[in-house]
Amino acid sequence: MSLVLLSLAALCRSAVPREPTVQCGSETGPSPEWMLQHDLIPGDLRDLRVEPVTTSVATGDYSILMNVSWVLRADASIRLLKATKICVTGKSNFQSYSCVRCNYTEAFQTQTRPSGGKWTFSYIGFPVELNTVYFIGAHNIPNANMNEDGPSMSVNFTSPGCLDHIMKYKKKCVKAGSLWDPNITACKKNEETVEVNFTTTPLGNRYMALIQHSTIIGFSQVFEPHQKKQTRASVVIPVTGDSEGATVQLTPYFPTCGSDCIRHKGTVVLCPQTGVPFPLDNNKSKPGGWLPLLLLSLLVATWVLVAGIYLMWRHERIKKTSFSTTTLLPPIKVLVVYPSEICFHHTICYFTEFLQNHCRSEVILEKWQKKKIAEMGPVQWLATQKKAADKVVFLLSNDVNSVCDGTCGKSEGSPSENSQDLFPLAFNLFCSDLRSQIHLHKYVVVYFREIDTKDDYNALSVCPKYHLMKDATAFCAELLHVKQQVSAGKRSQACHDGCCSL
């Protein structure tokens, strides 16, 4: 009896058709079916999706892969379907291209699954790199004949950076500090100093702590011995302004990422006050023992009050007599425009740091506002920033590009990365607008080496120029007094009969 039941079960299983699965393998060249003539071909895919997945955090740099899933269209042409080919093109610092062919193990007998739902398959295998744009295309096989447009489907996928919850486990991200938590604490000790504490990492021994409150008000380099375990580091940073509520930015310098490592931030709060216990007085337990203490306390309080009133009166008197010299002007907004051949890392960054630290300037750079430029357009962005800025500085330099390329390579900020040069556009825009003497005080030329003004920009020869660091004091003095000059109605007469657009 049992033998009969087993035979019936086997017969039933053989009667039910097996569902197709996929077997995928690399196929770099054209598919063999492309060389054949086909009267009928399967239709295109219904849907194509891509997402990154992690197979194992500890397997290495290629543990993060691309999960490509697709849905077949439910029509009669599915009976002709043999395989689906998927090709992925990646564009970043270098371009990659690879294809896989996924063969279906069984011929399709139905347009949908017997259990219900559309036919859905997936393939996991393409490695995912950081910050890369991928173009994924897929088509069914047999494909269209030669010189015919075949059905296909494509999607775009941009992989995130090291801050992503999946990508942070890549080796490159781990070496850049993606898993490091410095646990930053910062407190205001007094009006002149801020204490910053953080947890170090064995990845490096050099850090920079920077404090910002709309502008940079203090920074300090931190060097710690290279240790195999995390330790707690502390540094006291002098500040030049109100630091309560300011932002602390901790920049590590690791061998693998240099100055482009993952940065961490914290907030400055008031340091907790350490309470001193007041000793108990035995006289309080004696009748009348508190009276001398009360009289003494009243006498001390009266003396402190009188001294405080005198000091406040004296302070107000001194403040009134020296108000013009002690009042700090708000930061000067400076728009910096520079040609694309100037090295951003070695020239623009250093010049920006000089403006912020020595000239109390709030710097506007197109490099920092690429998103706004894309939204507004370069002309509208330049016009808006020119209106908001107190000074427009055109930075010139005859630095040799090869020097910058040799030290910067293809890193961010190198001349080769500048996709759009706003220098000629800014020159033409401001030149056509600034033919009136009223606006000439707003424009200035700064250079680091002796320069020859190009014929295209010969209007610069009549504009005020400053040679850094030779004229650093005079340059800062002009920036720091720009608001006083404007309020008093003083206009710079350094430019005559020319367009002072730089």
Curated annotation (Swiss-Prot):
Tissue and organ distribution: Expressed in several endocrine tissues, mostly in fetal and adult liver, kidney, pancreas, testis, colon, brain and small intestine; not detected in peripheral blood leukocytes, lymphoid organs, and most cell lines.
Domain SEFIR, residue spans: 331-477
Positions of glycan attachment: 67, 103, 156, 183, 197, 283
InterPro entries in alphabetical order: IL-17_rcpt-like, IL17R_fnIII_D1, IL17RA/B_FnIII-like_1_sf, IL17RA/B_FnIII-like_2_sf, SEFIR_dom
GO BP field: defense response; positive regulation of inflammatory response; positive regulation of interleukin-13 production; positive regulation of interleukin-5 production; regulation of cell growth
Domain of life, source organism: Eukaryota
Residue ranges of the TM segments: 293-313
A GO MF term: cytokine receptor activity
Pfam families, A to Z: IL17R_fnIII_D1, IL17R_fnIII_D2, SEFIR
Signal sequence region: 1-17
Gene Ontology cellular-component annotations: cell surface; cytoplasm; extracellular region; intracellular membrane-bounded organelle; membrane; plasma membrane
Keywords linked to the UniProt accession: Cell membrane, Glycoprotein, Membrane, Receptor, Secreted, Signal, Transmembrane, Transmembrane helix
Residue ranges that the UniProt entry lists as topological domain Cytoplasmic: 314-502
Role description: Receptor for the pro-inflammatory cytokines IL17B and IL17E. May play a role in controlling the growth and/or differentiation of hematopoietic cells.
Subunit structure, interactors included: Interacts with DAZAP2. Interacts with TRAF3IP2.
This protein's name: Interleukin-17 receptor B
